[in-house]
């Protein structure tokens, strides 16, 4: 009987073709943990307006970033899984995706359980907890009926914060930057008002990373939110707006890190490296660079392996108490 580890990421269309992107967006944007509007109101908007117009546009972006290995997010999650297998040779290490049809959470867990894996540790690859990512994963884990041990966030682990800080220091040293921005995926402010801890956890991540930075002056570090969707207010400051403000203030050299994304995806590759880069340059900015996400790097995989082993040890000690 082997211990099991399941890492879970958001997911991706199975191809960059419009029909597959439409199917993916329909699944993703129909999740009421993501869009909390009543279905009777939301579904006509989604099917009548958003999917017909957004699907082909998003498909264009996916085609820009698609690789021979497929979706970058899935490819880098596979790298993470494979490196975890090297670090945990006696474990059954698998990956799952929340949306998109490939690597379904429930089926993957049931297969692991049928092989006799016990206990099974589940790690959603989202450092900070929020309803629209972590909770929807945990709902599917619970619905599988498989007994699991869940690590639902890891933003406050010093080892994780040190890895982030080292990545930022390394990128900062390669250029002369006026400002370093830690940019997180945004969520609607209504979620925070209803008790979602995400904003506080992002702020804690930023504070933790700042204390481990060795080369970046803390006065140069700030945080923003990106990837706003729809007309309702989301967490501010918005990254795009802040980039325009910085350029207007003469801060023409900016480095952006994205702690809430552990693998490259449309938000890092298209939104930041293309759209936000173009916005910054069009408003007078000069140098715009990004810090690559973890992308299955060795230190991050070391961290995840230790996280899983420590969780099992803690559960065993708790059972003896």
From Swiss-Prot:
> What's the Enzyme Commission number for this chain?
4.99.1.9
The protein depicted here goes by the name Coproporphyrin III ferrochelatase
Q: Give me the residues that bind Fe(2+), please.
A: 185, 267
Q: Which domain of life is it from?
A: Bacteria
Q: Where in the cell is it found?
A: Cytoplasm
What SUPFAM superfamilies does the entry give? Chelatase
For this protein, the record's InterPro entries field holds: Ferrochelatase, Ferrochelatase_AS, Ferrochelatase_C, Ferrochelatase_N
Write down the Pfam families for this protein, in alphabetical order.
Ferrochelatase
Gene3D superfamilies reported in the protein's UniProt record: 3.40.50.1400
Primary localization class, coarse: cytoplasm
């Amino acid at each position: 009987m082997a211990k099991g580890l399941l890492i879970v990421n958001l997911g991706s269309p199975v191809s960059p073709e419009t029909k597959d992107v439409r199917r993916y967006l329909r699944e993703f944007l129909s999740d009421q943990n993501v869009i909390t509007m009543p279905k009777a109101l939301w579904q006509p908007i989604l099917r009548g307006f958003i999917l017909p117009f957004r699907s082909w546009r998003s498909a264009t972006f996916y085609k820009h970033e698609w690789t021979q290995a497929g979706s970058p997010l899935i490819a880098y999650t596979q790298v993470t899984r494979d490196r975890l297998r090297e670090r945990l040779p006696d474990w059954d290490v698998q990956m799952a995706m929340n949306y998109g049809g490939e690597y379904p959470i429930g089926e993957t867990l049931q297969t692991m359980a049928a092989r006799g894996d016990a206990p099974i540790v589940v790690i959603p690859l989202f450092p900070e907890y929020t309803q629209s990512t972590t909770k929807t994963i945990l709902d599917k884990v619970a619905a599988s009926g498989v007994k699991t041990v869940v690590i639902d966030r890891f933003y406050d682990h010093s080892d994780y914060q040190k890895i982030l800080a080292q990545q930022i220091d390394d990128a900062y040293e390669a250029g002369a930057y006026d400002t370093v921005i830690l940019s997180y995926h945004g969520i609607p402010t209504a979620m925070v008002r209803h008790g979602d801890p995400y904003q506080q956890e992002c702020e804690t991540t930023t504070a933790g990373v700042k204390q481990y930075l060795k080369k970046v002056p803390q006065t140069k570090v700030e945080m923003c939110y990106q990837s706003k969707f729809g007309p309702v207010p989301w967490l501010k400051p918005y990254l795009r707006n802040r980039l325009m403000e910085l350029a207007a203030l003469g801060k023409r050299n900016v480095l952006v890190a994205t702690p809430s994304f552990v693998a490259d995806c449309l938000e890092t590759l298209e939104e930041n490296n293309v759209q936000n880069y173009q916005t910054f340059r069009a408003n007078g900015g000069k140098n715009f660079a990004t810090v690559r996400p973890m992308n299955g790097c060795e230190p991050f995989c070391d961290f995840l392996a230790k996280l899983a082993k420590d969780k099992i040890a803690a559960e065993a000690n708790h059972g003896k108490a």
